[in-house]
């Protein structure tokens, strides 16, 4: 029976097969052993797994069943017998992670050659979302808790170890600094004393343990805990937490909070870059905010593609990101300031304590509050971020806030503040460079070009996640470990590009790079 006649000419599987035939699989083939012949060509397995993503089929057993029952999957196998789920699982875990990113780059270049992706006529739209990891929700390890337990254990060892050594009668003294290495060396010395004195260790009820045995057992127990704590802190690295069942996953707040209690779940922060409605790159990190992911992601994109205009939402706004783009002649940034919508509200405009509502004299470099008092610069503070960026903040202080009738409205008083409100003076913490960049960005995004790109960011960047989560039914990773989940996400990205290309062909929108404002 000829399977091909059963598949309509406009079916996405035909387009997928045609696009994937244009790709080079040398890097994927190189992951296999050169001895003998592969049971299934890597090209066919890649097609099958990719089409499974297009149809929302991700589990290997479901893909195996589809290869036996679905005509479209049979068409991709080109007469080969259906692979079993173990073959598909090995392909995804042992081979695909080493080549899938390069395959996406090939697909992007193919779309560029056919005029579907244009960095000149479109822009790079970046957005992020959090995808839940395939890990137990209550398998958390908190770095702060481990650090506290490590400190308390160190105090306990420092207190009890000298007593244990004295009771052992060996004459060995406790080290000044407690470390795993020194405890091992100490235990080795105690075992030598045991052999020298021919002491027999006992166990069970009715036996009195000698002091040497108690000392060795205590040190062994402490060593086990110390090693565990050191390993936990090492796994956490720069993160504050990790999951025991997927050590690369970090606990984050997810958008899907059905219990409405702010529950933390293990997951990954997935950032996606789109151009002309197609995904051109991905960046997966453990950062819970998008601010820190901007620079490494943009560096990665600029090394591969001719990036020019970059459009992001307010979650990416920071002084460090402004400085990075400002130092590049190639890049032009469009970012909506985080207070863009907030400052339109009446409450914001009537807040006399805000810097934005105070008059500023640029020549004298001073602010004037609602009561006519002057706030002048008294010092400049420098603060180093986790990434090493040094931010300069000017501190402006009012000379006299005594007996001010609007002091409660002007100065925000927290419950944790030790200084009473009567003794406090108004201070403003101002980053001059950040304010300068933000004001310039407000003008930039209000131009016709800025409005067009902001509207398209909402459609193209956020539309990617809408389609992947709803239409492609991808809401949670199936695999574990950053290498595996990256391969999984890159597959989903390529499947999205195929479906997007098919949709543009069917709707006659080939060659369109931006949505017009009237169409949006």
Stretches found by the model and what they are:
Residues 1-4:
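Short domain-edge segments at the starts or junctions of modular domains/repeats
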Residues 36-37, 79-81:
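A Lys/Arg-rich helix-loop hairpin that forms a DNA/phosphate-binding surface
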Residues 49, 56-69, 80-520:
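Anion-binding and metal-coordination hotspots
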Residues 75:
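Aromatic-lined, polymer-binding surfaces characteristic
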């Amino acid at each position: 029976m000829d399977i091909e006649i059963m598949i309509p000419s406009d079916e996405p599987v035909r387009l997928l097969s045609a696009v994937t035939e244009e790709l080079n699989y040398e890097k994927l083939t190189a992951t296999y052993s050169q001895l003998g012949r592969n049971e299934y060509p890597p090209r066919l397995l890649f097609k099958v797994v990719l089409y499974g993503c297009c149809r929302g089929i991700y589990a290997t057993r479901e893909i195996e069943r589809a290869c036996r029952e679905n005509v479209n999957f049979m068409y991709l196998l080109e007469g080969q017998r259906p692979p079993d789920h173990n073959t598909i699982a090995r392909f995804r875990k042992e081979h695909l992670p080493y080549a899938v990113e390069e395959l996406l780059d090939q697909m992007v270049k193919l779309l560029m050659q056919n005029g579907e992706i244009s960095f000149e006529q479109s822009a790079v739209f970046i957005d992020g979302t959090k995808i839940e990891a395939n890990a137990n929700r209550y398998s958390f390890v908190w770095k702060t808790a481990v650090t506290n337990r490590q400190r308390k254990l160190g105090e306990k060892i420092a207190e009890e170890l000298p007593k244990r050594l004295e009771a052992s009668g060996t004459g060995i003294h406790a080290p000044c600094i407690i470390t795993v290495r020194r405890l091992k060396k100490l235990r080795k010395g105690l075992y030598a004393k045991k052999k020298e004195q021919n002491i027999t260790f006992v166990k069970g009820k009715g036996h009195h343990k000698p002091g040497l045995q108690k000392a060795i057992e205590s040190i062994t127990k402490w060593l086990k805990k110390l090693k565990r704590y050191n390993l936990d802190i090492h796994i956490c690295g720069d993160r504050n937490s990790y999951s025991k069942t997927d050590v690369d996953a970090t606990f984050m707040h997810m958008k899907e909070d059905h219990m409405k209690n702010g529950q933390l779940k293990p997951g990954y922060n997935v950032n996606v870059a789109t151009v002309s409605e197609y995904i051109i790159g991905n960046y997966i990190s453990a950062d819970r905010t998008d601010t820190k992911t901007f620079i490494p992601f943009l560096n990665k994109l600029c090394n591969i593609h001719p990036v020019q205009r970059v459009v992001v939402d307010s979650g990416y706004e920071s002084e460090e990101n402004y400085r990075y783009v400002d130092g590049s002649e190639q890049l032009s940034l469009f970012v909506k300031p985080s207070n863009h919508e907030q400052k339109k509200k009446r409450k914001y405009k009537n807040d006399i304590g805000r810097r934005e509502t105070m008059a500023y004299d640029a020549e004298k470099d001073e602010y004037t509050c609602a009561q006519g008092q002057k706030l002048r610069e008294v010092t400049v503070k420098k603060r180093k971020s986790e990434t090493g960026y040094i931010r300069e903040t000017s501190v402006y202080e009012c000379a006299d806030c005594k007996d001010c009738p609007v002091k409660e409205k002007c100065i925000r008083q927290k419950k944790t503040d030790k200084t009473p409100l009567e003794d406090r003076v108004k201070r403003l913490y101002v980053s001059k460079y950040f304010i300068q960049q933000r004001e310039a960005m407000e003008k930039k995004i209000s131009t016709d070009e800025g409005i067009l790109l902001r509207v398209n960011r909402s459609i193209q960047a956020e539309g990617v996640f809408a389609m992947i989560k709803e239409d492609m039914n991808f809401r949670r990773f199936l695999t574990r470990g950053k290498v595996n989940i990256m391969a999984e996400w890159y597959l989903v990205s390529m499947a999205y590009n195929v479906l997007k290309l098919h949709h543009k062909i069917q709707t006659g929108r080939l060659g369109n790079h931006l949505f017009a404002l009237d169409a949006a």
